[in-house]
């Protein structure tokens, strides 16, 4: 909505819409505590079956009194336009009481160690700090004390020191990081104690792949990779995994396929390999997969299928047999 002001009566109308309203009021300035009480606590609003699940407001113009009312909101609370200067002690105290679906502090591009330490004491279980583009090791160490999940998707670089300082990486979202040095990858592997590791890497040097292969997790999801060298594939082939997903690869050389064919199971399950976007597969690559220990192979993106590839896949116990994207099939392959 393009509203610049909001009365309590207007707030009751919006709150009464429940989840039919998206909760966005980015242009409203100086929201009063009374109006905030209506939006956040549904004061004076008739019973709504499905209440609004998110509020998005201009946080820079809010008073501490207004924030105290907003802290009662049970859904996700997103405050835009904030700066460290705008976050007074009174406002931080009020925000610290919020225990709804998740707190977003938009506009903060950096965190001082003192502010990070304060945020670590907040009651909420989810912090969205996606505008932060700079984070010192000291601030990361302070933020590591926060027991919930923290989204830091605005960070684009991750040093080994920062990876170690962030604490439990199972609870840290770093979707903006698209490359890792071998040293940073080693730190990620060291700090990640979960089952499924998702990385938004768009490039994967062989040395980095070697470090990732040392991890003790069930699944490795690298779904933004569009290219994979033979050397990096060979390194990934040293992994013991239940699942390896490379769902954006459009091409795979025979050498890379032979490297991936070395995958080993983690425990009793797998390994499974998803290559959903591959458009073609050479007979040599298909032969490598057919002879591997892979238990499930997804190739739903294949556009063409040669006779040699078809014969090799027919011998594979892993190939799912699903080829919904196939547009070209030779007579020999069909036979």
Describe these PLM feature segments.
Residues 35, 66, 91, 139, ...:
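Conserved beta/loop motifs at nucleotide-recognition and modification sites
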Residues 330-335:
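Short, intrinsically disordered, charge-balanced linker/junction segments flanking boundaries
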Residues 1-8, 16-33, 41-63, 72-89, ...:
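Concave beta-strand-loop units of leucine-rich repeat
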């Amino acid at each position: 909505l393009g509203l610049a002001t909001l009365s309590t009566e207007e707030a009751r109308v919006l709150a009464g819409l429940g989840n039919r309203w998206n909760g966005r009021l980015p242009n409203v300035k100086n929201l009063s505590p009374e109006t905030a009480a209506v939006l956040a606590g549904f004061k004076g609003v008739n019973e709504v079956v499905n209440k609004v699940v998110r509020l998005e407001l201009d946080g820079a113009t809010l008073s501490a009194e207004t924030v105290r009312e907003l802290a009662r909101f049970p859904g996700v609370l997103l405050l835009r336009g904030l700066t460290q200067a705008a976050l007074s002690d009174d406002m931080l105290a009020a925000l610290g009481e919020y225990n709804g679906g998740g707190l977003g502090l938009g506009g903060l591009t950096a965190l001082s160690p003192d502010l990070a330490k304060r945020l670590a004491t907040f009651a909420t279980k989810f912090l969205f700090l996606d505008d932060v583009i700079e984070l010192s090791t000291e601030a990361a160490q302070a933020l590591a004390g926060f027991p919930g999940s923290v989204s830091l998707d605005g960070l684009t670089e991750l040093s080994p020191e920062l990876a170690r300082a962030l604490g439990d990486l199972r609870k840290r979202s770093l979707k903006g990081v698209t490359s890792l040095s071998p040293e940073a990858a080693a730190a990620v592997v060291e700090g990640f104690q979960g089952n499924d590791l998702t990385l938004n890497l768009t490039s994967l040097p062989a040395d980095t792949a070697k470090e990732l292969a040392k991890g003790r997790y069930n699944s490795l999801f690298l779904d933004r990779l569009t290219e994979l060298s033979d050397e990096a594939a060979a390194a990934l082939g040293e992994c013991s995994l239940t699942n390896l997903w490379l769902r954006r690869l459009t091409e795979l050389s025979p050498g890379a396929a032979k490297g991936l064919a070395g995958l080993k199971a983690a425990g009793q399950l797998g390994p499974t390999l998803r290559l959903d976007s591959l458009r073609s597969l050479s007979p040599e690559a298909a032969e490598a997969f057919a002879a591997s220990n892979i238990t499930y192979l997804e190739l739903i993106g294949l556009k063409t299928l040669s006779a040699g590839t078809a014969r090799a896949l027919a011998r594979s116990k892993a190939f799912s047999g699903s080829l919904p994207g196939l547009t070209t099939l030779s007579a020999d392959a069909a036979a």
